[in-house]
């Protein structure tokens, strides 16, 4: 067996180019660390004083010695006398070391026991040779690149023999959901509570939070089907836990989901040992070879959208709690809830709520985490700059964030958000029934995820067998290439435009939902200048929705068409997710008057919407108009409900329709044609929101007059408020 030799390089800090002046140690000699190995010369300009008192720069030759940075037998000189060396990449000698200190534990070589923390005057330290951490449960144990490569090669060989891959599993909102709200414990002990049945399989444990002795009771809900999922997938994958929770938290959760320790064993990595307080990296566990590693996580950003990642839909059982360990991470923006079509025609004699009648803006409001103050990414916890240094170098930062985390947990326990939400639900809906439960077991993500993981495993070993069958081929299949190839097929050819999905102030192409969609082959566009194939709409009344419907060749679908397609890794039929159940609207319903963004009437209404209709005092506006009309007519030509033309009437008030309230504002653009729909399809539940078909004749003219007059009144009111 040949000796493993250590190459010796000159420092990068030398004044290159240099010339070897002399080799001081004979080949075959044993040298100690710090022994002079060679002399080298170099030339540089120096300043010298002249006889006349002036100073000039002249070239001078200097000779220095280079000392051996390691201990061992000098097996081979790689340079000779008078040889010129241009940079530090040149190997000058090769030594055989008795110990290469490739495994470091707490500053000591784990092989020979030598202290390797010392550093010489050139900045060299044996600690730098073993700086790769690849174990799960401690950051104090590090290895060299060569040792890491050897260990991984052995692991890869074992997995291929077992026909398995490696699977990194996130905990919070991926396979479990956690809370410290004591309301859960009270509901679990009350058989009469409406949430009692869905809490039967919730587990709990007490955990001391840091050195303060503060204790929290955690309630853990398994994602439906978790036990079967882990058991089946463990036959195809070796399982690893990688969480941003604390080490104590990760161990307790691992005990609950794997009580025998058979599935995960000691392969549990927490943020305490991960080397980063805000990011996750495959290189932390697999520094040399990630070709057999798959990741499942509800957050793509913490992995920088690694090609080995399978992003799952976040599991939200405890409503509004979010990720209990996310205060270390950058804030994530939740997707908006899908706005539903209103099934009944609005009675004209009843006032409408703002949400029902006010046409929505194109984008969702800026995300305000204060609306979910019990989630760990809430405004009670300052957003942190991403920290990339190791835990050992950031103990103070870690301690500070742990204190903030404890503060957030205390807030969640004292505020009892689940109890507040359940009480609000019962107040809204009346007498408690099973349908009034706040918590629900309706998640099927693990079923879909199991199928995806099985498909990836099958494709990997199919490719691996194909490659190995070719003689002389030393390549192997790569999950990092297989997963993107499979994903790109799902939405290939789809150009997506979003409406009401991405909050204001968030760059569309940098948003999680856009990156997720693009990783599946979709193209994301910003407007209609590049015609989209799909409009993904979370809100039913936006300019983009109207324009897309009027164009006729764009599929206007709900947000869950996209999220479920991404979750299932297949393009689901759009017909099941159309924003309007009867999408193929007649051409007469898509008239320019109803939809065209260039329509003067619609433009004026849109402008008024942009100026916050909710701030208008409608009663005061009505009263002002009535007072103005009374002042203009001494003969009572006008009644209080409508205005008729008169020769003495100013041109600005020549209207012949009743004064409209805010509820009537959207009628020229949309109406609820429920009666007609019921006759067309008796089996159809609810009613469709249809464009107003009144585009010609007397009714159209009346509508146009209504819009003109209403716009004038509203603009006058806004001007008065502004003044």
Curated annotation (Swiss-Prot):
<keyword id="KW-0460">Magnesium</keyword>
<feature type="compositionally biased region" description="Acidic residues">
    <location>
        <begin position="700"/>
        <end position="715"/>
    </location>
</feature>
<dbReference type="InterPro" id="IPR036412">
    <property type="entry name" value="HAD-like_sf"/>
</dbReference>
<comment type="function">
    <text>Processively dephosphorylates 'Ser-2' and 'Ser-5' of the heptad repeats YSPTSPS in the C-terminal domain of the largest RNA polymerase II subunit. This promotes the activity of RNA polymerase II.</text>
</comment>
<feature type="region of interest" description="Disordered">
    <location>
        <begin position="345"/>
        <end position="380"/>
    </location>
</feature>
<feature type="compositionally biased region" description="Polar residues">
    <location>
        <begin position="639"/>
        <end position="650"/>
    </location>
</feature>
<protein>
    <recommendedName>
        <fullName>RNA polymerase II subunit A C-terminal domain phosphatase</fullName>
        <ecNumber>3.1.3.16</ecNumber>
    </recommendedName>
</protein>
<dbReference type="InterPro" id="IPR001357">
    <property type="entry name" value="BRCT_dom"/>
</dbReference>
<dbReference type="GO" id="GO:0046872">
    <property type="term" value="F:metal ion binding"/>
</dbReference>
<comment type="subunit">
    <text>Monomer.</text>
</comment>
<feature type="compositionally biased region" description="Basic and acidic residues">
    <location>
        <begin position="673"/>
        <end position="687"/>
    </location>
</feature>
<feature type="region of interest" description="Disordered">
    <location>
        <begin position="631"/>
        <end position="723"/>
    </location>
</feature>
<dbReference type="GO" id="GO:0023052">
    <property type="term" value="P:signaling"/>
</dbReference>
<dbReference type="Pfam" id="PF12738">
    <property type="entry name" value="PTCB-BRCT"/>
</dbReference>
<feature type="domain" description="FCP1 homology">
    <location>
        <begin position="160"/>
        <end position="341"/>
    </location>
</feature>
<feature type="active site">
    <location>
        <position position="172"/>
    </location>
</feature>
<keyword id="KW-0170">Cobalt</keyword>
<dbReference type="InterPro" id="IPR036420">
    <property type="entry name" value="BRCT_dom_sf"/>
</dbReference>
<dbReference type="Pfam" id="PF03031">
    <property type="entry name" value="NIF"/>
</dbReference>
<keyword id="KW-0904">Protein phosphatase</keyword>
<keyword id="KW-0378">Hydrolase</keyword>
<feature type="compositionally biased region" description="Low complexity">
    <location>
        <begin position="367"/>
        <end position="379"/>
    </location>
</feature>
<dbReference type="InterPro" id="IPR039189">
    <property type="entry name" value="Fcp1"/>
</dbReference>
<dbReference type="InterPro" id="IPR004274">
    <property type="entry name" value="FCP1_dom"/>
</dbReference>
<dbReference type="GO" id="GO:0008420">
    <property type="term" value="F:RNA polymerase II CTD heptapeptide repeat phosphatase activity"/>
</dbReference>
<feature type="active site">
    <location>
        <position position="170"/>
    </location>
</feature>
<dbReference type="InterPro" id="IPR023214">
    <property type="entry name" value="HAD_sf"/>
</dbReference>
<keyword id="KW-0464">Manganese</keyword>
<dbReference type="GO" id="GO:0005634">
    <property type="term" value="C:nucleus"/>
</dbReference>
<keyword id="KW-0539">Nucleus</keyword>
<feature type="compositionally biased region" description="Acidic residues">
    <location>
        <begin position="352"/>
        <end position="366"/>
    </location>
</feature>
<keyword id="KW-0479">Metal-binding</keyword>
<feature type="domain" description="BRCT">
    <location>
        <begin position="486"/>
        <end position="579"/>
    </location>
</feature>
<dbReference type="InterPro" id="IPR011947">
    <property type="entry name" value="FCP1_euk"/>
</dbReference>
<dbReference type="InterPro" id="IPR040078">
    <property type="entry name" value="RNA_Pol_CTD_Phosphatase"/>
</dbReference>
């Amino acid at each position: 067996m040949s000796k493993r030799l250590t190459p010796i390089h000159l420092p990068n800090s030398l004044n290159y180019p240099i010339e070897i002046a002399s080799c001081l140690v004979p080949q075959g000699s044993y040298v100690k660390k710090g022994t002079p190995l060679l002399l080298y010369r170099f030339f540089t300009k120096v300043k010298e004083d002249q006889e006349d008192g002036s100073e000039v720069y002249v070239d001078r030759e200097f000779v220095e010695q280079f000392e051996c940075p390691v201990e061992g037998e000098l097996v081979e000189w790689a340079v000779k006398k008078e040889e010129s060396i241009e940079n530090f990449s040149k190997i000058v000698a090769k030594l055989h070391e008795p110990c290469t200190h490739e495994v470091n534990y707490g500053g000591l070589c784990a092989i020979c026991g030598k202290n390797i923390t010392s550093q010489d005057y050139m900045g060299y330290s044996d600690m730098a040779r073993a700086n790769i951490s690849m174990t799960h449960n401690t950051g104090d144990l590090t290895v060299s690149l060569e040792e890491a490569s050897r260990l991984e090669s052995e692991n890869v060989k074992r997995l291929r023999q077992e026909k398995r891959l490696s699977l990194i599993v996130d905990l919070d909102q991926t396979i479990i959901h956690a809370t410290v709200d004591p309301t859960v414990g009270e509901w679990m002990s009350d058989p009469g509570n409406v949430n009692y049945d869905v809490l039967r399989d919730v587990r709990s444990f007490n955990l001391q939070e840091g050195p303060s002795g503060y204790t929290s009771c955690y309630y853990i809900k398994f994602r439906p089907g978790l036990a079967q999922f882990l058991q089946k997938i463990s036959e195809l994958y070796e399982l690893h836990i990688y969480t941003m929770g604390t080490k104590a938290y990760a161990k307790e959760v691992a005990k609950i989901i794997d009580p025998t320790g058979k599935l995960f064993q000691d392969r549990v990595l927490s943020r305490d040992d991960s080397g980063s307080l805000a990011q996750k990296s495959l290189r932390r566990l697999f520094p040399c070879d990630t070709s057999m590693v798959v990741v499942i996580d509800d957050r793509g950003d913490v992995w920088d959208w690694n090609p080995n990642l399978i992003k799952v839909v976040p599991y939200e059982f405890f409503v509004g709690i979010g990720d209990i360990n996310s205060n270390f991470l950058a804030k994530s923006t939740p997707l908006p809830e899908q706005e539903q079509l209103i099934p009944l025609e609005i009675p004209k004699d009843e006032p409408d709520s703002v949400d029902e009648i006010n046409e929505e803006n194109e984008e969702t409001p800026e995300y305000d985490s204060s609306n979910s103050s019990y989630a760990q990414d809430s405004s009670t916890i300052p957003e942190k700059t991403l920290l990339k240094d190791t835990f050992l170098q950031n103990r103070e930062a870690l301690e500070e964030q742990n204190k903030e985390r404890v503060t957030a947990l205390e807030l969640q326990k004292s505020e009892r958000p689940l109890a507040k939400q359940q009480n609000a639900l019962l107040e809204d809906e009346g007498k408690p029934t099973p349908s009034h439960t706040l918590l629900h077991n309706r998640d099927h993500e693990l079923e879909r995820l199991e199928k995806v993981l099985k498909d990836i495993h099958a494709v990997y070993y199919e490719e691996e067998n194909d490659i190995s069958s070719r003689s002389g081929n030393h390549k192997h299949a790569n999950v990092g290439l297989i997963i993107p190839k499979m994903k790109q097929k799902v939405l290939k050819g789809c150009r997506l435009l979003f409406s009401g999905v991405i909050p204001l102030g968030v760059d569309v192409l940098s948003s999680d939902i856009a990156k997720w969609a693009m990783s599946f082959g979709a193209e994301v566009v910003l407007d209609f200048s590049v015609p989209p194939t799909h409009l993904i709409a979370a809100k039913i009344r936006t300019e983009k929705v109207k324009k897309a419907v009027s164009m006729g060749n764009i599929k206007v679908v709900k947000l869950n068409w996209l999220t479920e397609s991404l979750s299932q890794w297949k393009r689901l039929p759009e017909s099941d997710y159309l924003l309007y159940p009867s999408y193929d609207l007649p051409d007469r319903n898509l008239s320019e008057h109803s939809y065209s963004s260039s329509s003067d009437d619609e433009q004026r209404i849109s402008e008024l919407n942009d100026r916050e209709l909710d701030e208008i005092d409608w009663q005061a506006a009505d009263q002002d108009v009535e007072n103005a009309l009374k002042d203009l007519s001494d003969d009572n030509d006008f009644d209080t409900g409508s205005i008729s033309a008169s020769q003495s009437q100013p041109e600005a008030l020549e209207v012949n329709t009743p004064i409209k309230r805010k509820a009537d504002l959207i009628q020229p653009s949309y109406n609820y044609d429920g009666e007609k729909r019921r006759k067309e399809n008796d089996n159809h539940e609810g009613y469709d929101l249809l464009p107003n078909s009144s585009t010609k004749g007397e009714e159209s003219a009346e509508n146009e007059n209504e819009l003109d007059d209403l716009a004038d009144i509203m603009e006058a009111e806004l001007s008065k408020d502004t003044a």
